[in-house]
């Protein structure tokens, strides 16, 4: 039994690709037809690819690995954050800072600084510092939290990355390739599927479509940690549909 149904994918609009003039020929095998200048993705293939991605993530986590969820485009930001938090994994949803993987030691020093300021805010240090200094510290804190908040507990480079739109996240993809990190992600008809170890052909521009697939990947993490299959867990998918239709 598949972890997702064609009905769910259809209702979420996962089948809508890009305009035919904006495409990558390497995605041809995942395209079903063309309608009104838009490519329609073959959802039968997407169902199988969601399964592959699901079990790839489940396998990583079951073996003690960590997953980093990445999606900095507006349509992905909320679901990447909420689903990563739901399954207890890391995320980047604002901006990919160059070197987040390849220069992780430097990133760790910035995370250390973020935690130092958090401690100062919580232990009463802010109350005894000059007002001007506190304002500057709060500004620094806000910026660090925005860019690094989702990875502040990440102690090392993750074993796998789930990415929404590899074309948008090209720096992340390059760094993952350099370090041999497993890449799983949603690729629209304008992407290069060969950049990913496990590709899910689908609409990466619709909030509902992105939420549905990211939620399934979070389910894979939860199943690996709890040993319970979540193939019937459609609540998040339905919630995604309701949110868009509301």
Curated annotation (Swiss-Prot):
CDD domains: RPS2. Belongs to the universal ribosomal protein uS2 family. Keywords: Ribonucleoprotein, Ribosomal protein. It comes from the Bacteria. The keyword Ribonucleoprotein applies. PROSITE patterns: RIBOSOMAL_S2_1. InterPro entries: Ribosomal_uS2, Ribosomal_uS2_bac/mit/plastid, Ribosomal_uS2_CS, Ribosomal_uS2_flav_dom_sf. GO terms for molecular function: structural constituent of ribosome. One of its GO terms (biological process) is translation. This is Small ribosomal subunit protein uS2. Pfam families: Ribosomal_S2 (PF00318). One of its GO terms (cellular component) is cytosolic small ribosomal subunit.
């Amino acid at each position: 039994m598949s972890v997702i149904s064609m009905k769910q994918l259809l209702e979420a609009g996962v089948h809508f690709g890009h305009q035919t003039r904006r495409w990558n020929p390497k995605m041809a095998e995942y395209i079903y037809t063309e309608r009104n200048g838009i490519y329609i993705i073959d959802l039968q293939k997407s169902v199988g690819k969601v399964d592959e991605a699901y079990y790839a993530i489940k396998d990583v986590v079951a073996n003690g690995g960590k997953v980093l969820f990445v999606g900095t485009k507006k349509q992905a930001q909320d679901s990447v954050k909420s689903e990563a938090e739901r399954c207890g994994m890391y995320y980047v949803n604002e901006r990919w800072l160059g070197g987040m993987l390849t220069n992780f030691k430097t990133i760790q020093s910035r995370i250390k600084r973020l935690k130092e300021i958090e401690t100062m805010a919580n232990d009463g240090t802010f109350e005894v510092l000059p007002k001007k200094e506190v304002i500057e510290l709060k500004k620094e804190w806000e910026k660090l939290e925005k860019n690094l908040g989702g990875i502040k507990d990440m102690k090392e480079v993750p074993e796998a990355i789930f990415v929404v739109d590899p074309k948008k996240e090209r720096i992340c993809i390059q760094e993952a390739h350099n370090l041999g990190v497993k890449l799983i992600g949603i690729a629209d008809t304008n992407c290069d599927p060969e950049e990913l170890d496990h590709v899910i052909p689908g609409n990466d521009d619709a909030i509902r479509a992105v939420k549905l697939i990211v939620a399934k990947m979070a389910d894979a993490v939860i199943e690996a940690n709890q040993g319970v299959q979540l193939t019937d867990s459609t609540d998040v998918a339905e919630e995604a549909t309701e949110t868009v239709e509301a």
